Structure formats: structure tokens, C-alpha cells
Amino acid sequence: MFSSGTTGMPKCIVHRAGGVLLNQKKELALHCDLAAGDRMFFFTTCGWMMWNWMAAGLGTGSSLVTLDGAPGHPDLGALWRLAGREGVTHLGTSPKFLQACMNRGVAPRLDDVEL
């Protein structure tokens, strides 16, 4: 796993396999209330640590929804339509994407989604 590289070059994060997975499962199960039957979608690339965090959701018995492409293509509503169509219960994305949606007046109804 590597750091994001936000403030410089990405750096390798040294860890042991079991401890990281156990902690991520704890975060998802206890802090996010993710469990069997839930569907998690966090728009991320596999190079960002959120991919590892999302993949750890499989340890809770939940399902993952992934997107191969841009969240704003063909329009900013595409990500929200995907979440609704796939029955996503837990959704995550970047603040920049949320700001872009706000700036363009995109206001999806997400009654059944935990952000």
C-alpha cells in the first residue's frame, strides 16, 4: 500500500498483512455498520488506500460495486444513477466530486444510502 502522494511522491507504507485487514474490517463493521447483505461503493482507484479499505469490506460479508471509468461521464449524475441501480447501501467518493455536483446543481435522492 502507498500513501496518496498529495504532498509529494507516494510513499510505501510498511505493514503486516493481518493487522491492517483486521483493523479495516473493524472500522467497516463497527464504525460504518457494514454487514452481510450490504452493498458498498467507494469511487476510488486501486492506487489509493481507499481501494484496500473497500476490498476489506468483503470480510464483513458485504458485496462491492465498482466502476471502471469516470464518475462524471457522461454527466455528474452517472455515479448517483449507478448507486441507485445497484442498490448501494454505503457510498463514498471525493470531496472534489461532491463540490462539482453542488456547483452544477446535481442533487440526487439517496434515502437508502449511508454516506
Where in this protein do the model-derived segments appear?
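Adenylate-forming
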Residues: T45, D68-G72, V88-L115
